[in-house]
């Protein structure tokens, strides 16, 4: 059997742009991640997506127009990746596209990711798989997180308990014991509140290198208020999003006289503390924690995590396991597309709470 190429496209809750990753599979077996491409969202597109997080007027029309806009951007990302690798559409077995989450409401049985999969298939000429969360939700799952099955397939070790931590807008953890089922859940905010505060105060998309946080100090009263959220006492499986952790929620916990840098420093430690608390509660004895996602580029956050987890758990980038930390989530959706094409169940039901394994996604033929 010849190796096959798949492309995964991911737009996370940070809403900064679209990542595309090209992977190589041998039938059902992972071989390697080959290449990555990224296209940023314009400020206008990001703002339009953010407004759809809240109930507003004419949502159906606005969401469908944005789904088409996103699909055209996704197609450009694919075409850019193909050109860089001297490949054509006929070289790709399938695309796996997550879309852009605008609402996640598992308690009501739905999760909405904006993308027009038929348009994406038409524009690229490549068979396209998407709508991965709906089938898990249909069998009483949370529809999230979906990446623990991918983490298990690539990173599980027969001799030690590992964990994989993705720090995107939301943080999620996959626990990979050597001799029992893997599981995972959303620990809470990742970069989401930090980014929202940065945009609100300094009109910048994120705190580059944690520079603003490094100028501040942790505010104990604010930290205690933020930690006093019912999400953290809920048992897993569980998942969350902007619906619970928004800028307005944060502002409701401020007195108004805090230094902006102190708020930022507190938000960084808050993310680290909630990750640590959730991980230790779920799996007290983790030997190695592998980190991916945009949060790995914040040295203040990584320092806080290393301080909290030391000396029992060693922290590493997923690069140590031969996968770039910025590529992991998009690679996961390429892998999910390969699972669909090979009829392999791929929902991590121990993580989502679904009552059984299911093949995730729906397929759309290219032109």
Where on the chain are the PLM-derived regions?
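Phosphate/ATP-binding catalytic cores across multiple sugar-kinase/actin-like superfamilies
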Residues: 73-81, 260-285
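Non-transmembrane, aqueous-exposed alpha-helical and coiled segments at domain scale
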Residues: 89, 259, 263-267, 278-282, ...
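Short beta-strand-loop/turn "lid" adjacent to the catalytic site in phosphate-handling enzymes
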Residues: 56-117
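Glycine-rich phosphate-binding/hydrolytic loop that grips phosphoryl groups
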Residues: 11, 15, 269, 319-366
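Glycine-rich phosphate-binding loops at beta-strand->alpha-helix junctions
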Residues: 102, 286-308
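N-terminal beta1-alpha1 ligand-phosphate binding loop
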Residues: 6-24, 296
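Conserved ATP-utilizing enzyme core subdomain
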Residues: 2, 17-31, 36-41, 183-272, ...
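Phosphate-binding/catalytic loop of phosphoryl-transfer enzymes
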Residues: 2-9, 106-111, 122, 126-205, ...
């Amino acid at each position: 059997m010849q190796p096959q190429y798949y492309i995964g496209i991911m737009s996370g809750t940070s809403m900064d742009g679209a990542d595309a990753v090209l992977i190589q599979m041998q039938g059902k077996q992972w071989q390697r991640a080959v290449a990555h491409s990224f296209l940023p969202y314009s400020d206008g597109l990001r703002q339009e997506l953010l407004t759809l997080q809240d109930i507003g007027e004419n949502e159906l029309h606005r969401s469908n127009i944005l789904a088409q806009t996103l699909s055209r951007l996704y197609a450009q990302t694919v075409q850019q990746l193909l050109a860089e690798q001297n490949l054509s559409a006929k070289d790709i077995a399938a695309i796996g596209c997550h879309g852009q989450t605008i609402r996640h409401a598992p308690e009501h049985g739905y999760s909405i990711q904006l993308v027009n999969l038929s348009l994406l298939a038409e524009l690229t000429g490549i068979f396209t798989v998407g709508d991965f969360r709906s089938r898990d939700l249909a069998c009483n799952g949370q529809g999230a997180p979906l990446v623990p099955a991918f983490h298990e397939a690539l990173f599980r070790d027969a001799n030690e308990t590992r964990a994989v931590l993705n720090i995107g807008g939301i943080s999620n953890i996959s626990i990979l014991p050597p001799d029992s089922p893997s599981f995972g859940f959303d620990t809470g905010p990742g970069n989401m509140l930090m980014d929202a505060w940065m945009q609100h105060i300094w009109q910048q998309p994120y705190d580059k290198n944690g520079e603003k946080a490094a100028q501040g100090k942790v505010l104990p009263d604010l930290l205690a208020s933020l930690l006093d959220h019912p999400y953290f006492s809920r048992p897993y499986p569980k998942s969350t999003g902007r619906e619970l952790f928004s800028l307005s929620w944060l502002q409701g916990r401020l007195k108004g006289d805090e230094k902006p840098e102190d708020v930022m420093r507190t938000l960084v430690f808050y993310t680290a503390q909630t990750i640590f608390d959730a991980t230790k509660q779920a799996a007290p004895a983790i030997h190695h924690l592998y980190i991916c996602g945009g949060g790995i580029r914040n040295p203040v956050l990584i320092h806080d995590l290393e301080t909290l987890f030391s000396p029992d758990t060693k922290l590493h980038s997923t690069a140590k396991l031969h996968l770039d930390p910025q590529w992991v989530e998009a690679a996961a959706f390429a892998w999910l597309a390969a699972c669909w094409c090979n009829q392999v169940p791929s929902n991590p039901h121990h993580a989502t709470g679904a009552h059984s394994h299911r093949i995730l996604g729906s397929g759309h033929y290219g032109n």
